[in-house]
A protein has these predicted regions:
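Amphipathic alpha-helical packing segments from all-alpha helical-bundle domains
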Residues: 78-81, 100, 124-157
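Hydrophobic/aromatic-rich alpha-helical bundle segments in the mid-to-C-terminal region
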Residues: 116-121, 128, 145-191
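Alpha-helical DNA-contacting segments of helix-turn-helix folds
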Residues: 62, 69-79, 83, 119, ...
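Hydrophobic alpha-helical connector segments
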Residues: 71, 85-111, 181
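A short, Lys/Arg-enriched amphipathic alpha-helix from helix-turn-helix/homeodomain DNA-binding modules
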Residues: 20-32, 78, 83-85, 130-132
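Helix-turn-helix
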Residues: 25, 29, 33-67, 71
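N-terminal intrinsically disordered/low-complexity leader segments
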Residues: 1-21
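Amphipathic alpha-helical interface segments
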Residues: 29, 33, 104, 108, ...
């Protein structure tokens, strides 16, 4: 779970590998519980029980339950942005970069449904957290995928919407990589975009 989460209010990042391992164990347990029973049906005691960790240990790293949720959101944001950068780095053509960006995200959703569910679930947990998450993605995509285009912000949000819904379609239909590529090309080269 070490995806360069550096500083978040309510989170005390450990300075040792052992401390980081304990914090990640708690975060992993919370992630599983949030994904299966939901944020509101999960208690700190449940998280600690699942992590086989004392409740006091939780409070060394997190002030509240919502702080571990924030930690997970930051982890996902960092992971998605780092991996998106890697996915599009070989492409210079803007259409190819956008295609690869959509492809990356659709594959991310199909391979990491828990992350996707927790990110979208944040709208019910803390609307500001949800807003900040998607604003961060949009701002990042503006520069990476659209450059100086004056409509870059609108296009960035449009791409996020398209990527999310295509990802859900890929999950629902259990699409192969080949089918995902075909679907993305149909969208990119249709009159829609």
């Amino acid at each position: 779970m070490n995806n360069k989460v550096t500083s978040i209010k309510g989170i005390n990042l450990p300075k040792t590998k052992l401390g980081m391992a304990k914090m990640n164990k708690l975060a992993d347990a919370a992630e599983e519980l949030f994904a299966t029973v939901g944020f509101y049906n999960t208690s700190i005691v449940d998280i600690c029980r699942k992590a086989n960790t004392a409740v006091g240990t939780f409070y060394i790293y997190f002030e509240t339950k919502i702080d571990v949720y924030r930690f997970l959101i930051e982890k996902y944001k960092n992971d998605i942005q780092r991996r998106l950068d890697e996915a599009i780095s070989a492409f210079t053509n803007s259409i190819e970069r956008r295609r690869e960006g959509i492809r990356f995200f659709v594959k991310y959703i199909t391979n990491s449904p828990t992350a996707h569910n927790i990110i979208w679930g944040s709208i019910a947990v803390d609307r500001d957290m949800f807003f900040d998450c998607f604003t961060s993605f949009a701002d990042s995509y503006v520069t990476k995928l659209f450059g100086d285009d004056e409509s870059a912000s609108v296009m960035s949000y449009s791409m996020m919407g398209i990527s999310n819904l295509l990802g859900l379609k890929a999950i629902f239909e259990k699409m192969s990589d080949e089918d995902i590529d075909k679907m993305i090309d149909e969208v990119l080269f249709s009159k829609l975009v």
